[in-house]
Every structure is written in C-alpha cells, then in structure tokens.
Amino acid sequence: MFLVNSFLKGGGGGGGGGGLGGGLGNVLGGLISGAGGGGGGGGGGGGGGGGTAMRILGGVISAISEAAAQYNPEPVPPRTHYSNIEANESEEVRQFRRLFAQLAGDDMEVSATELMNILNKVVTRHPDLKTDGFGIDTCRSMVAVMDSDTTGKLGFEEFKYLWNNIKKWQAVYKQFDVDRSGTIGSSELPGAFEAAGFRLNEHLYNMIIRRYSDEGGNMDFDNFISCLVRLDAMFRAFKSLDKDGTGQIQVNIQEWLQLTMYS
C-alpha cells in the first residue's frame, strides 16, 4: 500500500450536477432541430530510486484534501433505463429524456464517438468559443471518467450529469474570457476554476497549464471542459476513498491502476 498525501489547498465552491441548469432542454432541442443553440516521469530503480520516485509522484498525483472536503458534487446517479420515468420528474427532465433517445442510438447509450459528434455539433453553434473540436481520445477519456459502471458508454443519468456540468462550465468559460479572445488565459484560469468549484494550489495550476493550454498559456474550450471533467472525477474518486475524511487515502497497485488507466 502507498499513502497519497494531500496536494490541493483551500475550499472549492459548490460543484457538481444539481439540476439540469437553465436552457439545457432548449440547447439539445436546438441541436436536434438545427436551431442555434506533462506526462508521468520515468520509473526509478529499486532502493535508492524510491525518494526520487516519490518526489515525482508527489508532483503528478492530484490528491485532494481540504478542497475535496468542501467540494460536494452530487454523485453520478445509478444507471437506469432512459424510459424509467419517475413520477416527480419535471417536464424539462422528461424533454431531455426524449432527446436522449434521439441522440443515443439504438442501444440507448452514448459512446465516445456519439459524444464527440454531439459536442462538436454544439460548439459549431457557438463561434465565440475557440476550439479545435473535441477529439475521439478526449471523448473516450470523458466517457471513462463518467462511466460509473464501466460499460464503456454513458447511460441516461451519466450523460445527464455530464451534460449539466458542461453547460455550467460553458457559462463559467464565457464569464472569465474577459478579453473575448475565445480562450482562457493563464491569468484568468484560477478565477475560472474557482467559479467552477475547484480551488487549487499554484503548482497544480502550472501543471494544468502545461498539460491543457497552448504554448502561450491559453486554454481553448474543449481543453477547458476536458480538464474540468477529469478534475471532477478525481475529486469524487478521492472523496469516495477517503471514507474517514482525513485528507489521505491508501490504495494498492490494482486500485491505483484501475483509477488511472481507465480515465
């Protein structure tokens, strides 16, 4: 077993997927109708290489302490069939359920390819969002970190949770793109991440900029969303493993590989 020490600082605001958010049904309705709508370090040898390996690990692992304690997203709901309508569902949720049936295909699940097509159709209707488009590898990663039952696809509740977050984070992105460049600059990034519910330390911000931003430190929309989806998933994973709330977790090698390889 190895101990993952706390890495982040401060308190995140309320994140997560509470409710569908304003205009979600309209956005997807527009999509259907056509309306506008730093990589890991090399392994050290045995014995004397342990200290170096741990220092590298400490700089890479996004272990979550105080920030995770104050980040309280709703858990991804259990998978249910899209047609299982609950009596207390709002009309907006029911409308989303009907649209999901059109988007998901015959198996009523959203694959990485289907997610990529959906997201790229949406962003083409928002010329103010600078993006190279959502690639298949990005969408595979997004599906993996949201795939609570490891089917390789997103069911209705999983997709609804993801979509709700994307809509919320799109609003944050536009709010903090103060120079209207279509990107988030390195100076705008901390405020944007805090508004999205994540308050990180400077070291992790620098890591994120190197991983998700261009050479000028600017982050476009697809990288912004991809990064936040990953952060949300890592926060939730850490909180689920930190059962006693100490800000530390212990995982064995199999648990670590499962957590990191399918993401």
UniProtKB/Swiss-Prot annotation:
Write down which residues bear the modification named N-acetylmethionine. Answer: 1
Signal peptide interval: none
In the record, which positions carry Phosphoserine? 6
Provide the binding site for Ca(2+) 3: 177, 179, 181, 183, 188
Please provide, alphabetically and separated by semicolons, the GO molecular function terms listed in this UniProt record.
Answer: calcium ion binding; calcium-dependent cysteine-type endopeptidase activity
Name all EF-hand domain ranges. 91-125, 134-167, 164-199, 200-228, 229-263
Q: Which UniProt keywords apply?
A: Acetylation, Calcium, Cell membrane, Cytoplasm, Membrane, Metal-binding, Phosphoprotein, Repeat
Residues that hold Ca(2+) 4 according to the record: 132, 220
For Ca(2+) 1, which residues are the binding ones?
A: 104, 107, 109, 114
Transmembrane among keywords:
no
Q: Where does Ca(2+) 2 bind?
A: 147, 149, 151, 153, 158
Q: Where in the sequence is N6-acetyllysine found? A: 174
Q: Which InterPro entries match?
A: EF-hand-dom_pair, EF_Hand_1_Ca_BS, EF_hand_dom
Q: How does it assemble?
A: Homodimer or heterodimer of a large (catalytic) and a small (regulatory) subunit. In presence of calcium, the heterodimer dissociates.
Domain notes from UniProt: The contact of the 5th EF-hand domain from each monomer allows the formation of the homodimer and also appears to mediate the contact between the large catalytic subunit and small regulatory subunit for the formation of the heterodimer.
Q: What does this protein do?
A: Regulatory subunit of the calcium-regulated non-lysosomal thiol-protease which catalyzes limited proteolysis of substrates involved in cytoskeletal remodeling and signal transduction. Essential for embryonic development.
Which protein, by its recorded name, is this?
A: Calpain small subunit 1
Organism annotation: Bos taurus (Bovine)
Lineage of producing organism: Eukaryota, Metazoa, Chordata, Craniata, Vertebrata
